[in-house]
């Protein structure tokens, strides 16, 4: 218990591999699907979590996370609830590029990104780390409040999970 409320246990899962993960290409909020390895990984995590008592499975609404969540849902026998608040960070112009391409085209931005400056936003619609933290905190707090004393799975992206681990 915490503050008079029962804690919610959250099992956080990153989506399976995509071809863009293999190429080290920034996906952001582009809807890139799992590759064969990613589908295998999704089935494996579904099997690994099949003995867990899950009250709910929440997923980013992007295909790579949702497909991973469906594998968990198939094993658990409950539906996936898609939530846009679990989407990956918006990377603006950087989406679809590798870090080397970003560094060559926008060296100052690449430097700022690498330094993890909380207020810095990727050019043309990118999301700062502070904005990402606010979104992830709000989303996960809301999901946890709906399931006090229960266990849920949250299937998302590397940036979301990195943020979740830091809050």
Question: What is the predicted function of each stretch?
Answer:
Residues 6-7, 19, 66, 137-167:
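Active-site-adjacent alpha-helix immediately C-terminal to a catalytic or transition-state-stabilizing loop
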Residues 17-71, 122-137:
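Loop-to-helix element that buttresses phosphate recognition and phosphoryl-transfer chemistry
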Residues 23, 69-70, 103, 114, ...:
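A short local structural element in Rossmann-fold oxidoreductases
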């Amino acid at each position: 218990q915490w503050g008079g409320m029962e804690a919610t246990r959250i099992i956080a899962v990153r989506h399976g591999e995509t071809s863009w993960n293999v190429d080290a290409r920034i996906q952001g909020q582009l809807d890139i699907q799992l590759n064969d390895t990613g589908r295998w990984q999704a089935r494996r995590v579904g099997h690994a979590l099949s003995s867990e008592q899950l009250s709910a499975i929440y997923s980013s609404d992007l295909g790579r996370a949702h497909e991973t969540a469906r594998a968990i849902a198939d094993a658990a026998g409950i539906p996936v609830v898609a939530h846009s608040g679990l989407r990956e960070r918006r990377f603006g112009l950087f989406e679809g590029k590798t870090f080397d391409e970003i560094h060559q085209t926008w060296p100052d931005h690449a430097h700022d990104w690498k330094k993890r400056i909380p207020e810095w936003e990727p050019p043309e619609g990118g999301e700062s780390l502070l904005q990402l933290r606010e979104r992830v905190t709000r989303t996960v707090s809301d999901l946890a409040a709906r399931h006090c004393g229960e266990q849920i799975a949250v299937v998302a992206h590397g940036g979301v999970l990195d943020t979740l681990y830091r809050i």
